[in-house]
Amino acid sequence: MLRNSEISWERYCELRDGDPYLARWGFTMYRTYYGLGSDENWKALLEKAKEETFKELDECDHDDLAAKLKPIFQIDARSDQSLLNDLSLGVLCQVYNDKVGGDPMPRLESPVFLVADEHSLDQISEGNWIVKSVDADYPPREEIPIRTSTEENWWGWGRMELRQIPWLWKKLAGEDSRYCFRWTVHQADLDNVIWFHSSSMEEAV
């Protein structure tokens, strides 16, 4: 992942030097499900996010960049049943933009946050580590009426594996989320697809 990663590192340094708050990288993640067993799964999800991110950094390290990125990686975990329980992605965009609960993680080209909903947390027992990524500038809209066009559309969100966190961050360092989230004919199709990223960062830059 980190081969030829100067673009991301230089972009990070620009952001960091412009504002002390930006001396870290990662994403804000909202938990919207609080049912039976979800506390344990939420904790496991956060631990796995760090584990998978570090694993990706190590496997694709170049010029010891992983050693620079690991100490400043953070998942800004937001878990508040009274505030976040069962919120829609659209409402979460408002929560993010209004900085409810404090400033979210620094944005890159697009203000993207992650979501662990009921499906995400329930799937952990099956070994599936999948969350939703959402662009806060484009609150998801309901597909009413159902589109008749067969052309693929961009919906402002998508599904991704935890191991893709550093890949998403790198992509967002130089491109907006329209190049990071899947395009589908219908919004419901997103429930059945995962974001695809190139295995070569020379292509992904």
Language-model region placement:
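Extended, charge-biased low-complexity segments
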Residues: 1-155
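Acidic, proline/glycine-rich low-complexity IDRs
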Residues: 139-205
